[in-house]
Amino acid sequence: MLVNMNEVLRPAKKNKYAVGLFNAVNLELARGIIAAAESSRSPVIMGTAEILLPYGPLEEVSYYLIPMAKKASVPVVVHLDHGLTYDTCIKALELGFSSIMYDCSTDSYEENVRKVKEMADIAHSYGATIEGELGHVGDNEGSAEGSDHLADPSAFFTDPKLAKDFVEKTGVDALAIAVGNAHGAYKLPPKLDFERIRTIANTVDVPLVLHGGSGLTDNDFRKAIQEGISKVNIFTDINVAAVEAEFKKFQSMDKGLIDLIPAAVEAVKQESLVKMKLFSSDGKADIKNNQNVSANDIEALTKLVAAEVAKYLNK
């Protein structure tokens, strides 16, 4: 079933587990992710990122992600990860994505707040949820803080006091934080600031997101979730698992592309299952969001009702 992030992350925050976001730039990845979620009875977040659009255009990806989510027997969020531009975020909402991330973390704090607040209002009017980012998660070129490794890494970490202000001013439904994590496979061992995670989790009332999950140790994940992480982003691990399975299959056959597909799907399924069990989201598909309706929900519902009334009056 297609749901937004509130439906899966609020129960996760309350019950101390995390839901994985797995990016699916093609049908094989999507099939493996859904298969894992259904077999483990895990809620799941599936989507793509703006940086991945050259490998799977947003509109084309929506043609299979959204129908697959609706058909699934478990809650599935279809999410735009790291939307970098206003137009891409709007397009995702128009296509039916149930959640977006508007990443303005490299802007000034004031500009980040302004832009994300504007997009949050729009997303909520669609009944969708939105994730923002505060602090800067690097791209891992040489250290856990990417190309910024020559500077003090902690300078890019999320400030707990600003986190509270950011959430209150923007109305985001989830907050991605920088605590020593980085995108891509780690070249040097990461050092997560678990105390910072705990402090932020106790300061804000929305679920926290850990980007750059691929490459962290199992203990890193467990402790991060224990301290307050409710959503973990994964791509590198399933991407590598798929290509390794295809290469192994290719070496043992003399057939064509379609013979590689089952191997890729199964590899993605198995790697996703490992993560779902590690995050303790397995068996949680039927946990309902029983938290009180938020101000964002009320605002979104009010806008939807107003829009319907306006349509009626203009007939």
Annotate each predicted stretch with a short phrase.
Residues M1, K16-V19, L80, L175, ...:
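Intrinsic structural disorder
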Residues V3-N15, V25-L52, L58-P75, H82-V204, ...:
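Alpha/beta enzyme core
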Residues V19, Y102, I258-I261:
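Active-site oxyanion-binding pockets that recognize sulfate/phosphate
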Residues L210-G212:
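Thr-Gly-centered strand-to-loop micro-motif
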Residues T217-K315:
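C-terminal alpha-helical cap/extension of soluble enzyme domains
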